[in-house]
């Protein structure tokens, strides 16, 4: 539940779901909404895959999924799971034995696709492997790979077919007394995706893995995911998420956090508030923001920074941020600290100075949080 007593219009009541564990990461219940991505290297190239997993983890990924299409990939999972700093989800399609092998290799979770994993007997074997090796399971329903009998029944992929597929497989797992599972309802169509999740929310308390599948390239996929996932999250639906892009997995993680930050559901790093710039700007806003985004990537402390080109909105925005800079005249602007006007700074020195002030503010916030924790003990 995200409640703001001062600004109640920002409150989000999260759907009540049960909590499971993906490795050491809680998903569902009152746990933070986690951000995932998926590697796009050859899994058999363990070193390249591990390198990509580490890069994603450094960007903030809580969980990383790795495809296991064949026996050689399953063997590589031993090293990948051992070296990964975050829990690994094994992505399983068609070959149920790959799921068993991935569990044995150390995967924290097995993603199975109801449309191609096979019959109940095969699912039972996967469930046994998951239980034996302390794995959770994701039931990953996808509009593009629904079961044949559901396509015949409904005529085409649709929310009803997706929900029926998911509920059938929930029953399969529960019949095997297995409850450490989450479920996803993914389609490339945001309307279908949203409708499926909304219908499913009334039928199960399983945690939801969220995503708009095959969303597209960086720009189009970001917009699609922000609209589709943003609306569901705003409605309180969702426990873990992946932004699917035809792009670097690190970019998926960044966009995922930006969506959560925009809704006040999770905070990580510097939230930069900047204007689009116009003829009134007292400095090059666009270039400045580009540089600051790169130079402040190392800051993990949740905080806000306003970079506004002129005095129309600059002072007002700065009052609501930890650090702010508002363009003025004569090659300088005003620096704001903790919502208060502080001092002038030249445009030439502004970037270095802002980085320094953000770092100082981050240290102060961390120190305050540590002191509060110690006082509470």
From Swiss-Prot:
GO molecular function, one term: 4-hydroxy-3-methylbut-2-en-1-yl diphosphate synthase activity (ferredoxin)
Disulphide connectivity of cysteines: none
CDD domains the UniProt entry points to: Aldolase_Class_I
Residues that span the membrane, as ranges: none
UniProt keyword annotation of Protease present: no
GO terms of biological process kind: isopentenyl diphosphate biosynthetic process, methylerythritol 4-phosphate pathway; terpenoid biosynthetic process
Cofactor binding, per record: Binds 1 [4Fe-4S] cluster.
Cofactor: [4Fe-4S] cluster
4Fe-4S as UniProt keyword: yes
Pathway of action: Isoprenoid biosynthesis; isopentenyl diphosphate biosynthesis via DXP pathway; isopentenyl diphosphate from 1-deoxy-D-xylulose 5-phosphate: step 5/6
InterPro entries: Dihydropteroate_synth-like_sf, IspG_bac, IspG_bac-typ, NO2/SO3_Rdtase_4Fe4S_sf
Protein residues bound to [4Fe-4S] cluster: 275, 278, 310, 317
EC number: 1.17.7.3
Reaction catalysis annotation: (2E)-4-hydroxy-3-methylbut-2-enyl diphosphate + oxidized [flavodoxin] + H2O + 2 H(+) = 2-C-methyl-D-erythritol 2,4-cyclic diphosphate + reduced [flavodoxin]
Enzyme class: oxidoreductase
Keyword annotations: 4Fe-4S, Iron, Iron-sulfur, Isoprene biosynthesis, Metal-binding, Oxidoreductase
Function: Converts 2C-methyl-D-erythritol 2,4-cyclodiphosphate (ME-2,4cPP) into 1-hydroxy-2-methyl-2-(E)-butenyl 4-diphosphate.
Entries under NCBIfam families matching the protein: ispG_gcpE, PRK00366.1
Family, similarity comment: Belongs to the IspG family.
Protein name per its UniProtKB record: 4-hydroxy-3-methylbut-2-en-1-yl diphosphate synthase (flavodoxin)
Gene it is expressed from: ispG
